[in-house]
Amino acid sequence: MPFINIKLVPENGGPTNEQKQQLIEGVSDLMVKVLNKNKASIVVIIDEVDSNNYGLGGESIHHLRQKN
């Protein structure tokens, strides 16, 4: 059973539920096409990571966004 975990830091209110559905469908279709997996067995999880819980270069994404 393929298990795919997508981690996103939401920006500007997104992703929307429709965009999440498109990601789930698109990633599942790609697994079928590239790895010949059974679509019914593919699990896709989308984790939305708060910008205070993710850092780059020693600073939180929240802090970096405030600087720009």
Curated annotation (Swiss-Prot):
Enzyme class: isomerase
Keyword set, alphabetical order: Isomerase
Active site: P2
GO MF term set: isomerase activity
UniProt cross-references to Pfam families, sorted A to Z: Tautomerase (PF01361)
Alphabetical list of InterPro entries matching this protein: 4-OT, 4-OT-like_dom, Tautomerase/MIF_sf
Domain of life: Bacteria
UniProt EC number: 5.3.2.-
PANTHER family: 2-HYDROXYMUCONATE TAUTOMERASE, TAUTOMERASE-RELATED
Homology family: Belongs to the 4-oxalocrotonate tautomerase family.
NCBIfam families: taut
Designated name of the protein: Probable tautomerase jhp_0858
Organism (species): Helicobacter pylori (strain J99 / ATCC 700824) (Campylobacter pylori J99)
Higher taxonomy: Bacteria, Pseudomonadati, Campylobacterota, Epsilonproteobacteria, Campylobacterales
